[in-house]
Amino acid sequence: MIRDITLGQFYPGNSWVHRLDARVKIMVTLLYIVSIFVVKDFIGFALEALGLAVVIAISRVPLKFILRGLKPIFILIAFTFVINMFMIKGEVLVSFWIFSISREGLRMAIFMAIRLILLIIGSSLLTLTTKPVSLTDGMEALLSPFKRFGLPAHDLAMMMTIALRFIPTLLEETDKIMKAQMARGADFESGNILRRAKALIPILVPLFISAFRIAQDLAMAMEARCYGSNGKKTRMNGMKICSRDIVACLIFAAFLAMIILERILL
């Protein structure tokens, strides 16, 4: 399950989505996430899912690889579903003991589960189709207007990118530690949830040590390349909006307008 997390990973490719400007992809992803919380009915969610499916098809990232990222958050989705189903009051459909399931609660539970699934897939698609360097440059460019207020745009963008890239790195380290301890007789798969959680405690110390080691190696590599110097920073590849980026923006604007109209009219 640890290896199933796709957030923060990059899937190499040369598709139309891969070649889009990072700034465009970041803004489109943010607006798409906002639009997920705007829709209030099944038609809206169907449009959201259809738009995401089209982007996945164009990106040529295997659907199996993308759906694999949903496995680690299945418990969160199930927990959210159950909480919404039982906590929201309304017209009772089923009642047993002190629990009751309402029509409104079931509807909200389904909507929240769909929102989480679309949010995770949409966010993962950004990192899967954008190189880490391009992601950093895109974030810095979008944050650059705030420099006049003293915001260190470059450092903040670098921190966010490193945090994203550390997710698969730390998961890989966790997997290595678990396999090493399983080879020595550790059992992480038997017993109830509490017993499995307790079995993971011995992993924490070597994981923290490994994380500090990776962070130190990264810091030394950045210092060796004079990161943090006061000189003007340059890029090997400049960022430029081209025709395909404009077309992508127009298509997404039409999609967003359709979502808003559906929300208003239906």
Model-predicted regions and their roles:
Residues 51-61, 76-79:
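Alpha-helical transmembrane segments and their membrane-interface exit regions
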Residues 41, 45, 60-64, 88-96, ...:
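Transmembrane helix-loop junctions in multipass membrane proteins, especially transporters and channels
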Residues 25, 64-74, 248:
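Alpha-helical transmembrane segments and their helix-start/interface "positive-inside/aromatic belt" motifs
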Residues 14, 37, 60-65, 96, ...:
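Membrane-helix interfacial "entry" motifs
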Residues 1-44, 48-57, 141-151, 155-158, ...:
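Transmembrane alpha-helix interface motif
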Residues 73-186:
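Juxtamembrane/interface alpha-helical elements of multi-pass membrane proteins
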